[in-house]
C-alpha cells in the first residue's frame, strides 16, 4: 500500500465524474483541493460527509477550495447520489480502484469482528502547486468542512 505524506506531490489521476466527463487532478493546479475518499454512496456516514461539504460549499469555494469526492461506485450510482442530495461538486468513479490504491486508502477494514477490503475514509488537502498540505485520516463526517479549514496549513 502506498504511504503518502505531507509535502509529497499528490498523485495525478484521470477518471470520469458522475456525468461521465473526464476529470483529472492536474486540471486543478492553481486551486486548493479537498480530495475526499469515502466508502460508498448513499450510506449514513458518506451521506453526512457529502452533505456537510455541500452545506458549506459556498464558504469553501470562497476560500479557494475545490471539493472532489472519490469512491469506487459507478458513474450511475454517483449520479443518483448527486441528484438525491444536490451535491455541487464532482464525484469520481474509481471502479477499478486505481486511484484509491494510488493514494493508499484501499485496504483491510473491520466491521463487527469481520475483516474485509474497502476504502478507508481519508481526506487529502492539496495546495495550489499539487502538493499534499495535510491528510485527515478518519475525518469527522458531520464536521468535515470545519476540519478542512482548521487543518489547512498556511
Which ranges hold each PLM region?
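Chalcogenol-based redox active-site neighborhoods
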Residues: 1-154
